[in-house]
Amino acid sequence: MITNARVLQEDFVPRDVEHRNPEVNRLSAALEPLLSGEPAETPLVFGPTGAGKTCIARYTVERLRERLLDVRTTYVNCWTDHTRFRVLYALLDAVGQTVDVHRQSTPRDELLRRIRDRDDAPFVVVLDEVDQLDDPDLLYELCGVPHLHPILIANHEADFFAGLDERVQSRLRAGPRVQFDRYGLDELVGILESRVETGFEPGTVDRKRLEAIADAAAGDARVAIRVLRAAAREAEAAGAEALSDDHVRTAIPAARDAIKQRTVDALTPHQETLFELVDAAGEIAPGELYERYAEAVAEPKSRRTVRKYLSKMDQYNLVDARGEKRARTYAVVD
């Protein structure tokens, strides 16, 4: 049934994108000055999970590489690489400058100096989940490197800027905004149809099943593609020649569980502690949660940072933030 499993992987970037032409155009316009030897703008990409932010950013960078020979690019997930060292190491690794870098002995300033000194070509860097950086001041320093051109991706603009000091805010506020909204049902069906055409045998998946998958995904392309993947595996395991309603029904909860587990696995140690405390409590107020968290870890983060962590887990459907301000509580999403 599946002829090209690559189209069902989360990091797959299609040759042609669906329903995001305005966003592609805005990102392309921000990078356009590089084609004439001028510095790019610093685009700020916002939107909910599964809205195509990462895919479109990587797609736009790939199209830039086709037009500009002398350019370096890389992608960094700041949820995984959330420390200053890991981000700088990832950037240096992309340009082959990490052979003699050691986590314990190499001075942190040395990493940034190497990036500054290597100015032989424009360096376009996609910083995904940038609101997860332990040290947001790093953005100020990176934006000050003349040949380095970041694309910053986060979920909510207000939450992102709330975590920055005035100096960093001032440097970033001039950047063009690229706002992504959730996909509509027909848009998700179109995305799935494109994946099916590229990666499945003809006649194995009909539109009715794709509509059921898109409806269950509720605007989230990650969920839709994961359900399609799980349903196809169910069908292949059963020796079926085509996707059925039963395959889709079985795949929906399995796909959601897989996405949730993947997100839980990506949590930092402090986030994981918070998640476990919320899970153990059933439902808990922010003040009590912070007290338990501060007792559970050796070096607790600030209350503001903890609020940022909880907001991120809410955005990724791990916890449910109920109520407002003093009446707010948190509970784990079933």
Where are each of the predicted segments found?
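Conserved catalytic segments around the Walker B and adjacent sensor/switch elements
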Residues: 42-44, 66-79, 179
